[in-house]
From Swiss-Prot:
Cellular compartments annotated: Cytoplasm
Pfam families: HATPase_c_3, HSP90
This protein's name: Chaperone protein HtpG
Origin: domain of life: Bacteria
Source species taxonomy: Bacteria, Pseudomonadati, Pseudomonadota, Gammaproteobacteria, Thiotrichales
InterPro entries recorded: HATPase_C_sf, Heat_shock_protein_90_CS, HSP90_C, Hsp90_fam, Hsp90_N, Ribosomal_Su5_D2-typ_SF
Location of the region described as A in the Swiss-Prot/TrEMBL record: 1-337
Annotated source species: Francisella tularensis subsp. tularensis (strain WY96-3418)
GO CC annotations, alphabetized: cytoplasm
Main location: cytoplasm
Gene expressing this chain: htpG
Amino acid sequence: MSEKKYTFETEVDKLLHLVIHSLYSNREIFLRELVSNSSDAIEKLRYESISNAALNEDDTDYAIRIDFDKDAKTITVSDNGIGMTEEEVIENLGTIAKSGTKKFLESLTGDKSKDNELIGQFGVGFYSSFIVADKVTVRTRKAGQDKSQATKWVSDAQNGFTVETITKEKRGTEVILHIKKEHLDLLEYHVLKGLVNKYSDCINTPIQMKKVEYDKDGKQTVKDEYETVNNTKAIWLRSKDEVTDEEYQEFYKYISHDFADALMWIHNKVEGNLEYNSLLYIPQNKPFDFWNRDKDYGLSLYVRRVFIMENKELLPPYLRFVKGVIDSADLPLNVSREILQHNKVIDKIKKAITTKILSELKKLASKDKEKYQKFWDSFGQVLKEGVSDDYSNKEKIAGLLRFATTQSGDSKQTVSLADYISRMKEGQDTIYYITSDSYKAAANNPQLEAFKKKGIEVILMTDRIDEWMMSTLTEFDGKHMKSIIKGDIDLDKFETPENKEKFEKEAKDFEKVLKEIKEVLKDKVEDVRLSKRLTDSPSCVVVNDYGMSLHMQKMMEEAGQSFMPGMGMKPILELNAEHNLVQKLKNEADTEIFADLSELLLLQAMFVEGAKIEDPMAFVKLVNKYIR
């Protein structure tokens, strides 16, 4: 059959250009990526043949083979895995199905070191072949297909690709790389074997190369007989003492396609009523598309060394950054995704590994603060989801949280709740916090004034998830959590008797004017009262204890969500009785000026809080009216 010509989709063209011009210094990854693809193909066949043995075609000696030919200047990576149909070849090799590709390409900066890291997080897979090859040929036949229905794919990465139907005796895929002249040093047994041992030594499938013998003069002879060149015992089944740090790191890179080392790993063997082996990794950095809701996550589930699937049921969503492998002996080989969603063994494993991960993070936070800070900076926001999502582990997760505070000096989130409690003022039984859009907005919020004056530390929460998190985190270690922008604030125990008496006198003096201000503002406020929060600013707005904060209201509006009735939508206006503007208002006889100043005090407080102002132009005109 004649060959058909195709063009790459735009994203592939761009990615190929990046691979060829940006990753030449990381050329070794090509073999890791091709071996990984072959391993995946074999694992898929191993799984599908459980229910359809005919797919094996009487060949169950699964293996990956690596051959090289110095004369032809080629390296061939072949497998007897599941193979591909013509449609799958076009889909898998001509397009990038991975979501977020466009965003990834747009995020590249032109800085090679930064871009290499991004490319490593994205994973280039098969296309890494073009780092070392100027032409790639793929020959493949899907298991169960007729021998005459195989497919050949050819590309030089410059002019699209061609596809034609061929005959192929054995199922599976072979990738033939026509090596560029600057990479001909790869065409050596010891070089290729070294790359296998470096990057792919611990995979489950035998990797074979033809034996090489040397005579007394060191002359090399390549035999026709193949030998296995990798350690085929799965790394997660080996004893911790048998595995080096380098092997752990290379296996992480193999399963994650990350260029960077893992931050930490957790290798565990569980025996008893429930038996499984696990090897879990926490990356150093979050991938570029980490917040993409369509992105799949999950651990690789094996049953007695047979790969079953990537399964998100093994992890709660707030631990979706964890990579790794679970190998269970307590599940059937023919288990389906639907069965796993309601499987007691899976539920027990999930509970156990969640507990283990949180325990190891606690140890890390205690033993290596710098390393834990690296983890927190990358994954702290997603860990916060667990406070609301995982009630049984809420206290453990809360202990792992880190925040900026009024005493930490900058926006870096380094303070734990235990740290906060350890330096609470004598007599303080409440953990105070404020939520806001940014560190500066939080740190300069007028509602902090009384706390700063009294030396009471306040946690500054600026992540979007913080409002949701704090709706369920109401206490920690027996201490009540209190938002300083909600309800009344009782700091009387830190006041002198003179100041208490002074405030009571001011409250009586302002009783009449507060009612008049409320009448002027009508339904714009729930109440008007004197503030115990303010020392320098004239006004601020709060909501009642059970109402939705103005910050939360703003976020919901931005997300296009409507409000349920009775959620405390109207703000409470608080005034600083000692401020000149408030004193002027108290003594103002002109009703128009009184109304204007009342409105101005409300609007400027709303503005500082980042709340929505319905008519910004009216606010500006009001300010301009009284500028002298």
